[in-house]
Amino acid sequence: MRTRRLFLNRLEATPEPQDVVVVIDVLRSFSTAAYAFTAGAAAIHPVETAAEAIELQQALPQSLTTGAVPGGDPVPGFDFGNSPAALAGVDLQGRKLIQTTAAGVRGLLRFANAPSVFAGSLVCARATADAIRRLQPRQVTLLITGEWADRDGDEDVACADYLEALLAGGTPDPAPYEQRVRRSDFGRRFAAGDNPSLPLLDLDLCARADCFHFAMLAVRRTGRFVLLPLRSGELDVTPVDRIFPAGIHQLT
């Protein structure tokens, strides 16, 4: 199994992906998504703009919106920001979420036509690696979304490094990778404590490896791109270009 790295904000054209793409956004898109699934969310619909989110919400009864603008502030009028801390104690059982963010969701949609697309974050890294290994792909593309002109994106690079070690069959100590999330440029902004949209609790929740035993797989259902939790045993081990997770029709 080969791996390669791509950086979302360096791409001029979308390269042809081979087999599996993992779109990584540790701070915070796909950490927030993981906590939403843990709170009971049935599905997450990624969309590119706030206007699309509002339009889709009207078509999906009882759905909720979550997201942030560049820099991390919540999208005005949304039910939730892009914050795992904001979901603490919230019951999302059976609800559908609509998510828009400047990095993770944009990266996910950029590779919407890839054979298999996972949303990656540190909190479900091991489960993601386990799901990918079961697919036996020839190549895995790791897409770093958090690198910007003023941010090194090392929180996502650390997650990619951890995933690579896991995919190689290793048993790496997650602690150094967790520390890199905290010490990244964006991580230090949360630690500074001077921006209410970037709470320290979010950093604490995002910089924890392997909290959850599910991967997050993006699939197309009824014409929409949907993110779903993929738990151990739900993956039908077939060639990667014919992947079908058992039970997904029950979640959408």
Regions found by a protein language model. Give the residues of each.
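Glycine- and Gly-Pro-enriched alpha-helical subdomains that act as flexible
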Residues: 123, 127, 131-136, 150-162, ...
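Acidic/Gly/His-enriched mid-domain segments of enzyme catalytic cores or analogous surface patches
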Residues: 45-135, 139
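N- or domain-start disorder-to-order transition segments that initiate the globular core
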Residues: 1-8
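Short acidic, Gly/Ser-rich segments with clustered Asp/Glu that frequently serve as metal-coordination loops
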Residues: 10-14, 21-35
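Long, charged alpha-helical interface segments
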Residues: 76-106, 110-116, 154-252
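Conserved active-site and cofactor/substrate-binding residues in soluble primary-metabolism enzymes
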Residues: 27-31, 48-51, 102, 123, ...
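Conserved short S/T/G-enriched processing/targeting/catalytic segments and their helical context
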Residues: 37, 41, 50
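Active-site catalytic microenvironments in core metabolic enzymes, especially phosphate/sugar-handling
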Residues: 145
